[in-house]
Amino acid sequence: MPAKLSVNLNAIAMLRNRRDLPWPSVTGLGRTALQAGASGLTVHPRPDQRHIRFSDLQPIRDLIDDEFPAAEFNMEGFPNEAFLELVERHEPEQVTLVPDDPAQATSDHGWDFRKSHNLLGNVVGRLKKRGFRVSLFADGIPDPEALKLAKETGADRIELYTGPYGGCYDDPEKAERIAIELGRTAEIAIGLGLAVNAGHDLTVANLPLLVEHIPELAEVSIGHGLTADALEYGMAETVRRFRRACGETA
């Protein structure tokens, strides 16, 4: 089964926030993405609300509930109390926990599962009691012991950080080496009973190789590259192009 595509709305929100105006519309373009066959919408609401605002969350939840009940809402963030309260209020289908400092421009590394094992175990337990699927942001390094610790937290999935892979857009040999490593990491995780998502700097050009090395990839979450393409091709056609890159017929 092809990997599902979740469209990250943060870049759209960041463009909107350049002016005190309601456009481009986060929910409007989210609707277009879902109409074009995206499987879900992703947001990462940071404490300073520099892109997604807390006030965006309920309209996105309502859009999915009212118009696209088969789609999923994925909320990403560092698991402090403020983020967890947002999650519990807006009830996404999936919660992706990332080890971000609030000042970071973007997510750029996975969890240290040895150092953060107790924190993650407590947070995952809290979220699982509420019925959320939980994914943990993970580096693409085939470390069986670390992935075993991730599994022990009770998480359902990992999301492989693909930034280094995406950064090899002009070095195909290095991209191949990293894709092999990501594939090995995914294989270990799947063997432990974790499903595997992926995200960061994924494009129409580099998705096919990633999917080749991770044939059981469950989901990709894509924002920057997809939004950049949408400026050229339009949101609907861009979503279809990314779906085809994931192996779907679109």
UniProtKB/Swiss-Prot annotation:
Its main location: cytoplasm. One of its GO terms (molecular function) is pyridoxine 5'-phosphate synthase activity. The keyword DNA repair does not apply. 1-deoxy-D-xylulose 5-phosphate binds at residues 46, 51, 106. Keywords: Cytoplasm, Pyridoxine biosynthesis, Transferase. GO terms for cellular component: cytosol. It catalyses: 3-amino-2-oxopropyl phosphate + 1-deoxy-D-xylulose 5-phosphate = pyridoxine 5'-phosphate + phosphate + 2 H2O + H(+). Pathway: Cofactor biosynthesis; pyridoxine 5'-phosphate biosynthesis; pyridoxine 5'-phosphate from D-erythrose 4-phosphate: step 5/5. Its EC number is 2.6.99.2. One of its GO terms (biological process) is pyridoxine biosynthetic process. Pfam families: PdxJ (PF03740). SUPFAM superfamilies: Pyridoxine 5'-phosphate synthase. The active site is at residues 44, 76, 200. The keyword Ribosomal protein does not apply. It is found in: Cytoplasm. The record marks 159 as: Transition state stabilizer. Belongs to the PNP synthase family. NCBIfam families: PRK05265.1-4 (NF003626). Homooctamer; tetramer of dimers. Catalyzes the complicated ring closure reaction between the two acyclic compounds 1-deoxy-D-xylulose-5-phosphate (DXP) and 3-amino-2-oxopropyl phosphate (1-amino-acetone-3-phosphate or AAP) to form pyridoxine 5'-phosphate (PNP) and inorganic phosphate. This is Pyridoxine 5'-phosphate synthase. It comes from Rhizobium meliloti (strain 1021). The gene is pdxJ.
